[in-house]
Regions:
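Short amphipathic alpha-helix with an adjacent loop that forms part of the alpha/beta core around
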Residues: 1, 59-72, 423-430
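Conserved N-terminal Rossmann-fold NAD(P)-binding element of oxidoreductases
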Residues: 10-14, 438
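Phosphate-binding loop of NTP-binding sites
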Residues: 25-31, 48, 61-68, 79-223, ...
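Nucleotide phosphate-binding/pyrophosphate-handling subdomain across enzymes
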Residues: 2-8, 18, 25, 29, ...
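C-terminal helical cap/extension that packs against the catalytic core
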Residues: 50, 236, 375-433
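N-terminal beta-loop-helix "entrance" segment that forms/cooperates
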Residues: 36-55, 150-154
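Short internal beta-strands
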Residues: 31-38, 219-223, 356-359, 381-391
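Beta-strand->loop->alpha-helix junctions that form or flank phosphate-binding loops
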Residues: 36-37, 55-60, 99-106, 144-145, ...
Length: 457
């Protein structure tokens, strides 16, 4: 089906952050956009306000008429939806065009110059930074992001630009559908081993991804990664890191809550870059974003302005309260390396404060595979409160609970295990200097209430 033949789009799994960006793209195009999701959320309610038709019952009879016309309706589904899902079965049995989200993005990277950001972690922030730099520059861009940009209040940007910035998701090998013009790879720490099986298979998936970069384009890869890329002829290769590589930072200054550095580049150095969201880990993310934007023609002034005005991403080191007496923030970190970096950054920012984390582990398989790494990362903090595991798409695994992490926290770390339903009461009955909520599950739904409780103290 050609994209110009599509009159309606139906999403099986409408409420995911990545799916909603594509839904908004088609809504802007004036198409009929509808879908199913398991439960209502702030995001699905917002999509409904924007004109999307969403229902929350697995029932093919609720599919709108316009989405039952197989010659003009594109069906998009998320891999998290089980194969036996009634609505998905209906579309398959009736010969509809059915694509994964990544296939749709792949089509867009063939119609535009795709600037893609892949990696186990850092990809949402880096892609959102790059999109903001590009969008406010003379180049402009479209963008499909994995988080809500605080600059734009949405997870996509639509323009007439030839560029499209895309967060390249390695889950289920989805990023193999993409055909990047350029790509950043931030990290390759093993994850999704329920899908990949082994670390070697995970790394091989990234290696294959590098083969997909189009001749004339470029790979910008973190210099510390284990993987060996395999590039087509005509693809340039650059590396980056915090203090070494083709692109890196020098003269880093962290003072009074501000972060400034010099951007070192083989094209043109840029002095006194100021981070609009002053978090230490964002220096390295910013280097990668600036590198890709600069390679495509952004000027030094545009790079500086983009970085200075970057406002961050919802749930990525997202400050909710920031006073002299109390700091409260939420962070989507759910892989041990992400937890480590978040804990390290918050420790650097608040060296003399007592830091408490409430962590909801995400997935039984991830907890089983990395519980020791989670414990080590969390042990940088003073106090750790663990809730039960958020299962997402998984069934329970015998013997795999948050207790595994709890038992491996280092001596000296104050620790507690509570039920998710008891989090608000816990916050009411304890005092905090710095409190961070960590995880990719549904504990984030309680963040507004936590903020309210803390503000009332």
């Amino acid at each position: 089906m050609n994209i110009e033949d599509i009159k309606a789009v139906y999403f099986v799994g409408a409420g995911g952050i990545g799916m909603s960006a594509i839904a908004r793209y088609f809504l802007k195009k004036g198409l009929v956009v509808a879908g199913y999701d398991k439960t209502p959320s702030d995001l699905t309610r917002q999509l409904e306000k924007e004109g999307m038709l969403i229902h929350y019952e697995e029932n093919k009879e609720l599919i709108p008429f316009a989405c039952k016309q197989k010659t003009s309706c594109l069906v998009i589904y998320t891999p998290a939806i089980p194969a036996e899902h009634q609505e998905l079965k209906f579309f398959r049995e009736n010969g509809f065009e059915i694509q994964k989200r990544a296939q749709v993005l792949g089509t867009l990277t063939q119609a535009h110059k795709g600037l893609c950001v892949a990696g186990t972690h850092g990809k949402t922030t880096t892609s959102t930074m790059c999109a903001h730099i590009m969008h406010q520059s003379h180049l402009d861009c479209n963008a499909f992001l994995g988080g809500i940009s605080k600059n734009y209040g949405t997870n996509y940007i639509l323009s007439d630009s030839d560029y499209v910035v895309i967060e390249a998701d390695e889950f289920d090998r989805s990023f193999h559908w993409l055909r990047p013009w350029m790509s950043v790879i931030t990290s390759t720490d093993p994850d999704h081993l329920d899908i990949y099986g082994t670390k070697e298979a995970y790394l091989e998936s990234f290696r294959h991804y590098t083969e997909l970069i189009q001749p004339g384009g470029a790979l910008i890869i973190h210099r510390d990664l284990e993987m060996k890329e395999h590039l087509q002829e005509g693809v340039s290769r650059y590396d980056y890191s915090l203090t070494e590589g083709d692109f890196h930072a020098e003269n880093i200054r962290i003072d009074s809550g501000e972060i400034t550095f010099d951007f070192i580049s083989p094209i043109e150095n840029v002095k006194d870059v100021q981070l609009g969201q002053p978090i230490p880990i964002n220096i390295e993310n910013g280097i990668a974003a600036m590198a890709m934007a600069q390679l495509n023609g952004c000027t030094a002034e545009e790079l500086k302005y983009g970085m200075q005005t970057y406002g961050g991403v919802d749930r990525r080191f997202d400050f909710k309260i920031k006073t002299d007496k109390l700091v409260f923030l939420s962070d989507y970190a759910h892989h041990p390396k992400e937890i480590y970096q978040s804990a390290k950054s918050i420790r650097e920012l608040y060296k003399n404060k007592h830091i408490t984390a409430i962590f909801q582990p995400h997935l039984y398989t991830r907890t089983r595979d990395f519980y020791k790494d989670f414990a080590e990362a969390l042990s940088q903090l003073d106090e750790v409160v663990l809730t039960e595991i958020y299962p997402a798409r998984e069934e329970p695994i015998e013997g795999v609970t948050s207790q595994l992490i709890y038992d491996n926290l280092k001596p000296g770390v104050k620790k507690e295990m509570i039920q998710k339903e008891d989090v608000i009461n816990y916050v009411k009955t304890h005092q905090f200097e710095v409190l961070i909520v960590l995880g990719a599950g549904d504990l984030d739904n309680q963040v507004p209430q936590i903020s309210k409780v803390l503000n009332s103290k």
